[in-house]
């Protein structure tokens, strides 16, 4: 049993380790509001395509 088998062998059903960005699979800076599940970097890139508009 090598290091790779042991390191991520525990099941991740909840908490930060179980969620990732749907665009880039990043786990940091995740926006979960409204069921987006997208990281903040990808949100800035795809916000207009999703339908968010910047207010002046």
UniProtKB/Swiss-Prot annotation:
GO terms for cellular component: cytosolic small ribosomal subunit; ribosome; rough endoplasmic reticulum. GO terms for biological process: cytoplasmic translation. GO terms for molecular function: structural constituent of ribosome; zinc ion binding. It comes from the Eukaryota. Zn(2+) binds at residues 21, 24, 39, 42. NCBIfam families: PRK05766.1. This is Small ribosomal subunit protein uS14. It comes from Lonomia obliqua.
């Amino acid at each position: 049993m090598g290091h790779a088998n042991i390191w991520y062998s525990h099941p991740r059903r909840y908490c930060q380790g179980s969620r990732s960005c749907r665009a880039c699979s990043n786990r940091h800076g995740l926006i979960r509001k409204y069921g987006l599940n997208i990281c903040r970097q990808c949100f800035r890139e795809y916000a207009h395509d999703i339908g968010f508009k910047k207010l002046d």
